[in-house]
Amino acid sequence: MAAEQLYKRGEKDPVGAVRLPGQWRRTQNIAMQARVEFLHQSEFIGFTARDLDNPQHEAIVFHGSQTIFDWIDDFEFSLDSFPYIGTNWSSDMPVRTEYGFTQLYESLRFTDVETGTVQSLAQFLSTVSNEVSYTVAGHSLGGALAALHGAAVGYRGAHVTSYTYAAPMVGDKAFAEAYQSLVKTSYTIVNKPDIVPKLPGSLLQYDSIPQMILINSLEYPEIKHCLTCYHHLTSYLYTLGCSDCDLGLCRRQTRQS
């Protein structure tokens, strides 16, 4: 939820406080350059943070997309090589990922919140240390970026823990197998009626990343039944037991007798 606090569509360097647990402090803002029609020229997509009590623990958080169904309409779901992790060791085949996600991932820019120094994705990855433990997390489009980033960071020898919510499939079977080897701890959280994690689908040679945790918002009568709310982050968190999460527009209205 912390990334959602900072989210203003189209804003490259968001301002304002963000509530992080304990001694965690935000260190960088992450923006992506639009390469698809429905996104702005440059859009804030997340942040990095460091635990001051344990500087060897860093987090990379990506927020979700309000345009996920636009993405479904606009992306072609073509697979392309993913150059950040080499080949899949079990089959010696190059891993392939969804072209649009890969283009957005390659466009990421990391801006230091104190100095304003900007790093490209390649520069960020060059700083990855195997002495640091990284946690990556994301929802929806952010979950797709988190999966790609987790694999790329893990490929550089670091220990990675990944949490993705409502994320679509991002690559083929070779990517899924490589991801399982590279990301030591992975939680892929999927709401049963949400269609997005089922896309683009196995018929197009895509495969889900492992360690899926299935939840079901249909078991909660207070959550509205619609495609948008099945996919919404608050529905996910509420179903997972977040008592402080406000369902907002996804709360089903009860009829007055």
Each model region followed by its residue ranges:
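Lipolytic serine-hydrolase domain surface
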Residues: 172-257
